[in-house]
Amino acid sequence: MNYYGSKELAAAFRTVRKNTITIGEEIPEEHYGYRATPDTRSVGETLVHIAVGTRFPAQIHFVERRGAMAGFDFMGFLSKITAEEKAPRSKNEILQLLHVEGEKFAQALEGLSEEFLGERVDLMPGMTPPAKSRFEMLLGPKEHEMHHRAQLMVAERALGITPHLTRQMQERFAAMQAAAGKG
């Protein structure tokens, strides 16, 4: 019995995507070109990278249903994604892309069987481990998004914005302190 299945995977992904969209909404469009360092993605580029980041696992697991990665044209696929990331977009277009791509991926996750999630996929020769379950591989997009969302939260701080999750935590602590003081 699996206690964390497709519905939980989809719900967790939706939560992560909702928080990413909130960050995108809170950063003013004039700061979408901000880069923490010259050799990093801008805020806007990072948000688009996150938005289209689900296309790789979708191709592997939902379109091709690959059992092995050998023979997959990773560089060809990556070049298409990279071109997509470079297309100019407004803040609203980026937020819409995040929403649409995120919901499409979450819906695909939601309907997966436990059997499908348990299937092993052989990775590229020489990789360690040599294979992973689809479940582990499909956790990857959420982990990838959280990695880049942390970068966006640092950018928010550099731009003078307190991230919404930090504000929410501060509000909870303040409420607990106020309640403790009344006792």
What residue ranges belong to the model's regions?
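Short acidic/glycine-enriched loop/turn segments that link adjacent beta-strands
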Residues: 40-42, 125
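Surface-exposed patches in mature extracellular/periplasmic domains of secreted proteins
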Residues: 32-35
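Alpha-helical transition-metal enzyme core signature, strongest for iron centers
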Residues: 13-20, 43-58, 88, 95-105, ...
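Membrane-proximal, proline-rich intrinsically disordered regions
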Residues: 27-28
